Design a protein with these regions (language model features):
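Catalytic Walker B motif of ABC-type/P-loop ATPase nucleotide-binding domains
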Residues: 115-118
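Helix-to-loop junction immediately C-terminal to a conserved catalytic motif
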Residues: 3
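Conserved catalytic motifs of ABC-family nucleotide-binding domains
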Residues: 111
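Conserved ABC transporter NBD signature motif
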Residues: 11-19
Length: 194
């Protein structure tokens, strides 16, 4: 929604003070290139190696890099998620946690200002979920990115969230820090924190 892949039913979405629901195509594309995505299932191309997945993304967003510059960007992105040694592996050879890390490297390779995470810890064990949550924090600090994290994993929300919004039927019903929401007067909101 934040990159206006789909149309908003109601409300407004502002990025850097610009109402994106009203932007023309070219203006919207200028916003989109500033946003990285980490999809719930990783969304890696099965027929491409890790290197090829990252190269495809980089070439799609940046047309003026030499092959050497592209390779350096790929290595830097993989090093930032601790998976440089997986550069020539196929997605099927990677664990779920490794696929999530590669998906994050793919989001990072375009040097976004904002990263949108869709259920970054979904389908992972508790230890790997915590590692991914901590990696999100590391990425925020190292690359100075803002993060929007969509999650049902309250442990992830506690680790990564400065502000948490709770939605019910598409409406925001609560907003605050983890500690504030944990003590909410609303029993339904508190039920998420048990």
């Amino acid at each position: 929604m934040h990159s206006r892949i789909s149309k908003a039913d109601k409300g407004s979405i502002k990025i850097s003070g610009k109402e994106i629901t009203e932007l023309k195509y070219d203006e919207l594309n200028n916003i989109r290139v500033r946003i990285g995505f980490m999809f719930q299932n990783g969304a890696l191309y099965d027929s491409m190696s890790v290197r090829q997945n990252l190269k495809f993304t980089l070439k799609h967003h940046t047309r003026d890099l030499s092959d050497e510059e592209i390779e350096n960007e790929i290595i830097e992105a993989l090093e930032s998620v601790g998976l440089k040694e997986s550069i020539d592996k196929m997605p099927a050879e990677l664990s779920g946690g490794m696929q999530k890390r590669i998906a994050l490297a793919r989001a990072l390779i375009i040097k976004p200002e904002i990263i949108l995470y869709d259920e970054p810890t979904s389908g992972l064990d508790t230890i790997t979920s915590r590692e991914i949550s901590e990696l999100i924090l590391d990425v925020q600090k190292k690359y100075k990115t803002s993060s929007i994290i969509i999650t049902h994993d309250m442990a992830c929300a506690k680790i990564t969230g400065n502000r948490i919004l709770i939605l019910k039927e598409g409406e925001i019903i609560a907003e605050g820090t983890y500690a504030e929401l944990e003590k909410s007067k609303d029993e339904w909101v508190r039920s998420f924190f048990i």
